[in-house]
């Protein structure tokens, strides 16, 4: 039986069949793109994936998937419910083996899908407050009433997100500080969790990898369910999640 705040070492398509209908608020996942020869990088069949996603999501649930081309284009075209992209801009490029043939890749897309309008909590940034007074006469519309716009300085988010990649941090004790080659930064996952869910909601990550989505959920008081087929990554993710849970109990 699938329980909250747990991850499972099993095929996600089989595991999702055990999740009740309409019980998930958001899917936030970095699925395999199928662009490398790594054994963990086998792309999932879109038809079976969407069948399970739409079944387990609440009517206003949202699917948020990381991607790169050509995977991202195939993913968008696999369902009529693609809505928009975020762009995650990293601080360090990738693809150095092809640097003489094409530009380095410094971004990933984050695709958003939904059937009904989902939860959306804009993550404001703070700018300078301002007050604007428009003239009573404009070139395009002629004479009109004077308009005053007052802002407290809050800025709505734009669709480009700047977060340092998890693998861009200096290694500790001479070894790398990540446990998965495509590990995402916790702060980026926290941003997405805060944007698309509320406290107490349940997030599914069906390709849990290093456990970052679970860590973000724990930090932001959301529930999580995860699946990870690779036993090595599963064990490391479990250890990481337990350490975070133990840390949170201290406060």
Please name every model-derived segment.
Residues 1-226, 232-235:
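Core catalytic lobe of class I
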Residues 1-2, 238-251:
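Short, conserved SAM-binding/catalytic segment
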């Amino acid at each position: 039986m699938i329980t909250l705040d747990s991850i499972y070492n099993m095929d996600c398509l089989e595991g999702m069949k055990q999740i009740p209908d309409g019980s998930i608020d958001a899917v936030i996942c970095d699925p395999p793109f199928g662009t490398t020869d790594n054994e963990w990088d086998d792309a999932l069949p879109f038809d079976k994936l969407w069948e399970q996603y739409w079944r387990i999501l609440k009517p206003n649930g949202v699917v948020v998937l990381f991607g790169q081309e050509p995977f991202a284009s195939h993913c968008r075209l696999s369902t009529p419910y693609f809505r928009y992209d975020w762009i995650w801009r990293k601080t360090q490029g990738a693809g150095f083996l092809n640097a003489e043939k094409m530009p380095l890749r410094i971004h990933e897309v984050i695709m958003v899908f939904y059937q009904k309008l989902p939860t959306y909590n804009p993550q404001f940034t703070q700018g300078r407050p301002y007050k604007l007074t428009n003239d009573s006469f404009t070139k395009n519309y002629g004479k009109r009433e004077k308009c005053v716009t007052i802002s407290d300085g809050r800025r709505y988010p734009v669709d480009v997100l700047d977060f340092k990649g998890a693998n861009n941090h200096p290694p500790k004790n001479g070894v790398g500080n990540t446990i998965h080659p495509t590990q995402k930064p916790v702060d980026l996952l926290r941003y997405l969790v805060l944007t698309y869910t509320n406290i107490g909601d349940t997030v599914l990550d069906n390709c849990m990898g290093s456990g970052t989505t679970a860590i973000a959920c724990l930090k932001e008081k959301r529930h999580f369910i995860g699946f990870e087929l690779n036993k090595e990554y599963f064990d490391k993710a479990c250890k990481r999640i337990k350490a975070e849970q133990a840390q949170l109990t201290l406060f």
